[in-house]
Structure formats: structure tokens, C-alpha cells
Amino acid sequence: MGQPVRVAEKISPSSPGTIRFETNRPLTGMGHCYYHGAEDALSDEDPADVLASRLFARGGIDYLHVHGNVATVDLSKGYTSEGIVDIIAGLFAHYEI
């Protein structure tokens, strides 16, 4: 159970490999969060840090920026965004039935 998160994936027309994921839930407060790797995610409780840990564990990500309800991902060359929507959508799920 938990709050279901709806996610809209928007590919940048001007920057190939950059994808915005807009959610119906806030991921941060007023601040911006920048991640170059999983080591930048310091908290096990902060939603943005948890998301960063999960996305970098998935692989294929060079950079992540999270602000408000938007996560912007720069994909590594040769990788697709497959599976990222599911990771974000499951962020606030504590268990599945």
C-alpha cells in the first residue's frame, strides 16, 4: 500500500537523452537536488535520495536533477528510459498486493 504515483514521461526535443518525468506527487520541497551517482544520495528517507539510489542502481543514467514534482534524467549513451516510469511510480509504495 501507499500512494500511487502517476508519471508522465516527456522526451526533450532539443537534447537527446534527456527525459523529464513529471509526477502527481512532490519529490522535493523548494530545493533542487542534483545527483551524479548513487553516492550523492545520502538519505534513506528523503524521496529524492531514494529515487536517485534506485535509478542509479538500475544503471544507464549519467545525471539526475529533482525539483518539486519533476525528475530530469540524462541517460548514458546507448541506454533507453525503459523501466524508469515503473521505478518512479513505485516510489511511495510500501508493499504491493
What are these regions (language model features)?
Residues T80-F92:
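Charge-rich, low-aromatic oligomerization/scaffolding segments with amphipathic character
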Residues H94-I97:
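Conserved short beta-strand edge segments in small beta-sheet-based binding/regulatory domains
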Residues L27-T28, Y79-S81:
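Short, surface-exposed beta-strand-loop junctions and turns on beta-sheet-rich folds
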Residues P13-A41:
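Short glycine-/aliphatic-rich beta-strand segments at the starts of folded cytosolic domains
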Residues M1-G17:
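Short, charged/polar N-terminal "headpieces" of proteins
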Residues T23-R25, V73-K77:
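Short beta-strand-to-loop capping motifs
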Residues S43-R58:
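Short amphipathic alpha-helix segments
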Residues L55-V70:
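Short acidic amphipathic segments
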